[in-house]
Amino acid sequence: MKKVAIVSCYFKKNYGSLLQAYATQKILDKLNIENETINIDENIDFKKGKKKFYKSQILNFPFIKSKIGMIKLKLDRKVNKKLNKNLEIREKKFEEFRNKFRLTKPFTTYEEIAQQCEKYSDVLVGSDQLWLPVNVVSDYYTLNWVPNKVSYATSFGISSIPKKYYDKYRKFLSRIDFISVREKNACELVTDISGKDAELVCDPTLLLNKKEWLEIQEEKPIVKG
């Protein structure tokens, strides 16, 4: 049987994204399904797509407002040396945790990934908030560039989709062979936009038991205090 390729947010330095990406890979391991996660650390197409979206939001006040916390944190890090040091320690630990992933070689374009698809039986996207408008515009988590595709517990991250993005959402949702999501509202969004049904499933982090999570838990806190 061919491998399954996983498309996840394994590179984000936050607990939710990394743990969900890890759990998705671990669950496939438990099912004896050979798998690996697509490496887009150096992907030009992905970066261009995100830049394009952010440029389009320059005059969108609600969007700018939602990023104020991120901007404030960057400024705080410049003036608060202790905060910056603690965050650097945390980020280093995130990088170390990434070593638990089986990553492919880095792919610089979507075309490069598509050319490798014959190696995989399916490409699985999930979970996390991968179907936010910014990600749909960047066209990576849509899986538009591969033939055999499924989603597991993927989230839209928002309760409604702006009408101007409906065509983009309809295009990629209608081409996914099997769709599962982690929120009831997301099931409704899939049906409303594409006319397709979506299965409601639990987040992959809930599929691992306590013992399995304790196996990767640090004995001591990363940062004191």
Language model regions located:
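A nucleotide-sugar donor-handling region in carbohydrate enzymes
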Residues: 103-120, 129, 153-155, 159-225
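Aromatic- and Gly/Pro-rich donor/ligand-binding loops
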Residues: 4-15, 19-171
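Glycine-rich phosphate/diphosphate-binding loops that line cofactor/substrate pockets in enzymes
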Residues: 1-2, 223
